[in-house]
Structure formats: C-alpha cells, structure tokens
C-alpha cells in the first residue's frame, strides 16, 4: 500500500498562534491549580489519618485497654516526683500480721527422739516455753440448720402448732450468707454466674445453678431500691458531683451506663440512650444546683448548674497537638500552666486555705489568655470557597483553642473553687469496675439484669467508699435489713 503523504497544517497567523498558546496555557494553569488543591486535600487527609493512628491513651480519650500490645508505654511526663521514698510511708496504717489471743487450735509440740545419754525424751518432764508461732488458714464449710415445728394440746383441748420463722419458706433453701456471697462475687468481684456457681461448689460443696445466682441478684436489687434511691437524692444535694457515661452491651445492643458520684456516694443508671433523653429519664440533674464536673459532653450543658470541665482530657489533647507538630510551643506552655495551677490548689488545700490568693488567680487567668491568643495565630479558622455555605471542618487544634477560650470559667473552675477537682477521675474510676464486668462477661443478656447490676453496684460502691463491710451489708440485706449508707 503506498505511503500516505503527511498532512500539512496550514500556517497560522502570529495572532492566532498566540491566542491558541494562551488558551492552552490557561487550561494547563487551571489543571495545575486543581492538582494543587487535590494535593493539599490529600496531604491534609494523610495528616488526619496519621494523627488518628498516633492516638492512644496518653494523648486522647481512648482507654488504656485499646493501646496496641506491642507499643511501649509512654513516659509519665506529666507526673512530677513527689519526693517520697518508695514503699510504705511514715504513720500509714499498714497490715502487719500479729498474734491473736484466742486461736481456734493450740498444738503443743512434744519432745521426740533420744538424748545423747540414750534416754528417751518422751519420758522427760517438760514445761512450755514463751515462744509461740501461729499459722492462719482459711476454712470454708457448709453449715445446715434444720428447723422443726412442734404441736401441743392445751388443757382446754385446743391444739397449737409452732410456725417456721420468717424467711424459712421451703423444704430446702439457701440462707442469707450463701446469697450474699454469691451476689458479692457477681456484682463486686465481677465473676460470671457460672464461675460463681463453680466456686461455691468447689469451696463449700453448695451446688447452685447459674440461674439461681442470677435470681439472687434480682432479689438483692429489689431489696436495695430504697437505699439506692436515697443515694441519688443525696447526690442532688451535694456541692460538687462528677458525671460520666460509657457504652454497655445489653441484650446484644449498645446501651449506656451513666454515673453520678462523689468521693462517698455513687449512683449508676442504665439507659438505651446517651444524651439528654437519658439524663431526663434518670431525673437527677434537673434538681442539681452544685458544680457538675464532666468531660464537656454537650448533653450536660443543658442543665443550669455550674459546670467544670475535666482537664485530664485537655492535657491529653494538648499532648496530641504537640506530638503532631513538635515545632509548636504553646501546647507545652499551656500544659505547664495547668499543672502549675493544679499543684497550687493541692498546696492550698493541704495548708487549710479556703481559696487561692486573688493575685495568683488573676495571674493564672492572664497567662492562660495570653497563651490562647498566641495559639490562635498558628491555627486560623478554615474557610470554604467563596459563595459556599457548606460547613468547613476545623482542625482539632482550632476546636480545642475555641473550647478553652469560650469556656474559660469552666476549664479553670478548679482554681476559683477549691472544692472542685482538676479532673473527672472520680467518675472515671467509678466507671472502671462496670467496664471490667463487661470485659469478663461480654455484656448483659437482659435489660433487667443490667438494671439490677446498676442498683447493686451503686449500693456496694457507696459502702466501699465509706469503709463498710460489703459482704456483711449484703447478708443483712437478705435478712431484710439493708444498712443505710451515710448520706450527708
């Protein structure tokens, strides 16, 4: 096939060629601009994903249990040396083992063997020496009490029969000690029902079905409704209270465990929702007029009480920002300021002061404002394209700065009111044991079981804070007389 001659483009005029090149240049510039915008978006997204991967319990609100097992624990940079020596401190109560005056068994060790002269030592007159040693052991055994009734005939001829005491209702049943021990294991020691039944059978030969253990918990919860209701009403009257919430698996679905607490009182409630509907249904915060310490969850802001925010959360967020951009100095300065203020409040309480000196408070507030003003220069507000009404996502640093600035009084409440703690660790500690229950058992099979757990745990946690024997309290509960916690 003959080769086709090349197509010859007619020559362009200089003006036409210039116009074409300008159009191509404009198109290429537009493409470069689009690519640059895409690169910027991708870099921003990569930064967000890297920051998300770098988050763990030391720089975010993630729990320590979510940290990778292969990751080395971070250094406790915020923990300052206390100056105390390791081990037990001077004048602490301790738990030294001491001899008891009335041992259950006494064993006198006889002489044995023969003397060098050949006489048998068993025939030698002896006297007890003052030295004695005691071995403490644990004996767990079943104790069965049998009740029998009697009948008698009065002189008038009327027949009388004795009656069984209250609580002895069946031919064979378990006493308050067994029920109290089972509930203590499931609701305080966090054992599952099956393992509780196994332990009772192993230790004491008492054969319980897991369903029986569950029924004992339901009975205890029914008997403790009044004391736990009183605990909730007492919390409403407190000057400072802590609140928190956490997810709970109930009947295969996500529900929420809410806690309201102080150093001496604890109230738990389970609800299907986390926010305002749940708090309204629980019904305590509507009557609360003190200072509520929490982690800035928006549902709490609807209540008219005073608020204080958890600064442990703020410290973790500041650490995350500092690690994301090591060149920034303001996160470290703000961390140092908050820790300095916290230390000042500890020293003031130890000295018996009712408040920090006014000049110190003013200085802390001034330095706080200066640091946030400086921080805002490095993290300006993001804006969208001209004419766009779409909300632009802001950086975590910008959001934190805005929150710390707009809610300065709530963040620094611990400075102006020494009754208020620096953080919300009280509520987080009270949340920890129910979370352990979920880790051990995987969740609750029914909503009734979860609510029973909340009632019993409220009671036991409160008694524990007040140094009351929780087992004996449960025993008295099954006897119909649950001890009332101190509510003042």
Task: Give residue ranges: language-model regions.
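Short, flexible loop/hinge motifs at secondary-structure junctions
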Residues: 1-172, 243, 294
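Catalytic center-proximal scaffold of phosphoryl-transfer enzymes
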Residues: 2-8, 12, 33, 40-41, ...
């Amino acid at each position: 096939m003959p080769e086709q001659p090349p197509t010859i483009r007619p020559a362009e005029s200089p003006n036409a060629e210039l116009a074409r090149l300008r159009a191509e240049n404009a198109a290429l510039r537009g493409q470069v601009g689009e690519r640059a915008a895409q690169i910027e978006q991708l870099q921003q997204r990569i930064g967000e994903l890297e920051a998300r991967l770098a988050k763990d319990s030391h720089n975010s609100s993630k729990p320590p249990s979510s940290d990778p097992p292969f990751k080395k624990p971070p250094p406790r940079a915020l923990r300052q040396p206390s100056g105390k020596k390791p081990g037990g401190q001077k004048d602490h109560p301790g738990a030294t083992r001491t001899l008891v005056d009335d041992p259950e068994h006494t064993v006198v060790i006889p002489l044995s063997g023969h003397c060098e002269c050949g006489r048998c030592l068993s025939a030698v007159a002896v006297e007890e020496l003052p030295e004695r040693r005691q071995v403490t052991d644990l004996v767990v055994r079943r104790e069965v009490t049998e009740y029998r009734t009697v009948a008698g005939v009065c002189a008038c001829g009327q027949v009388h029969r004795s009656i069984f005491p209250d609580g002895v209702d069946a031919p064979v049943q378990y006493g308050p000690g067994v029920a109290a021990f089972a509930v203590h294991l499931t609701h305080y020691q966090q054992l599952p029902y099956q393992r509780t039944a196994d332990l009772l059978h192993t230790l004491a030969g008492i054969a319980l079905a897991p369903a029986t253990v569950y029924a004992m918990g339901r009975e205890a919860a029914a008997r403790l409704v009044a004391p736990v209701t009183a605990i909730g009403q007492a919390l409403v009257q407190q000057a400072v209270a802590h609140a928190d919430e956490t997810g709970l698996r109930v009947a295969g679905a996500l529900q929420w465990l809410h806690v309201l607490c102080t150093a001496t009182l604890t109230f738990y409630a389970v609800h299907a929702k986390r926010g305002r509907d749940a708090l309204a249904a629980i019904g305590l915060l509507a009557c609360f007029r003190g200072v509520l310490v929490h982690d800035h969850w928006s549902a709490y802001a609807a209540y008219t009480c005073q608020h204080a925010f958890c600064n442990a959360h703020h410290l973790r967020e500041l650490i995350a920002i500092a690690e994301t951009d090591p060149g920034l100095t303001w996160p470290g300065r703000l961390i140092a300021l908050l820790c300095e203020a916290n230390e000042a409040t500890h020293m003031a309480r130890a000295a018996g002061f009712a408040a920090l000196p006014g000049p110190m408070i003013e200085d802390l507030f001034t330095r706080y404002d200066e640091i946030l003003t400086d921080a805002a220069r490095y993290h300006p507000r993001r804006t969208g394209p001209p004419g766009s009404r779409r909300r632009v996502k802001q950086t975590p640093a910008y959001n934190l700065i805005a929150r710390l600035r707009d809610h300065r009084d709530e963040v620094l409440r611990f400075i102006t009111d020494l009754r208020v703690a620096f953080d919300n660790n009280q509520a987080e500690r009270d949340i920890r044991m129910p979370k352990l229950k979920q880790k051990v058992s995987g969740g609750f099979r029914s909503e009734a079981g979860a609510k029973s757990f909340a009632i019993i745990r409220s009671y036991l946690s409160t008694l524990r804070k007040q140094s009351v024997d929780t087992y004996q309290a449960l025993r008295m509960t099954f006897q119909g007389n649950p001890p009332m916690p101190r509510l003042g």
